Amino acid sequence: IFADHGEGMPRGKTNGINFGYRVPFTIWFPEKYKHLSPWGIGTSTDELVSFEDLAPTLISLAGGEMPQYLKGRVLIGEQRSPEVDKLFLSSDRADNGIDMVRTVTDGRFVYSRNYMSFMPEARFIRYMEIGEIKQVMRRDFEKNVLDPLQRSLFEPRQAEVLYDIENDIWETKNLISLPEFSELAAKMRDALDAHILKRRDVLFLPEYEL
């Protein structure tokens, strides 16, 4: 059982931060198949899991031949893949709201690169604009009654953000410019660059060329 997007509130859904990427995910193991669980029964895990892992896992359990183009890993069963120490994530267009974000996380720190930093987190997406909460937010923004943190949702983003989601679950303290996090930021930048080149990310092309 899983959701298809992050928190369904403004700033969550459709945004390239942990708040937008993270979804609930539950696996139920009947008595007959509980031996397939590497985590035990009735427990939770902080293992890094991606939607990319679902197809390889199901194909493996069904005894099928694994297509070479699949990128995920097998989560459970005899062919379970080793755990990963980081996940690479992406967020792009949502309906009429263009965007392009690439992210890497180790489970605690989340580094996101906003290629369209001129687009605010609360960018105009028609589907969301008809909701009452978004209308109230825009009205308060226009009336200048929001505090700086609240206003930031309607202002251009920083090109890079680095959040410690263990100590900052709402992702409001960007650590990217702090000297004590410079080494970590550099490692995450390099990892993301290498991943983008390895995967040959086609969404860097204009949409009309895809």
Annotate each language-model stretch with its function.
Residues 3-9, 15, 191-210:
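Short, solvent-exposed turn/loop segments enriched in Gly/Ser/Thr/Pro and often Arg
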Residues 5-10, 18-20, 108-112, 163, ...:
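Active-site regions of oxyanion-processing enzymes, predominantly non-cytosolic
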Residues 42-106, 173, 181-186, 190, ...:
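Polar, surface-exposed loop/tail segments
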Residues 10-15, 38, 60, 123-124, ...:
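Short, solvent-exposed loop/turn and secondary-structure capping segments
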Residues 1-46, 50, 69, 96:
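Histidine-centered active-site microenvironments of extracellular/periplasmic hydrolases
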Residues 1-3, 24-27, 54-59, 162-168:
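Beta-strand elements within well-structured catalytic alpha/beta cores of enzymes
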Residues 18, 94-177, 206:
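C-terminal, low-complexity/hydrophilic appendages and adjacent surface loops
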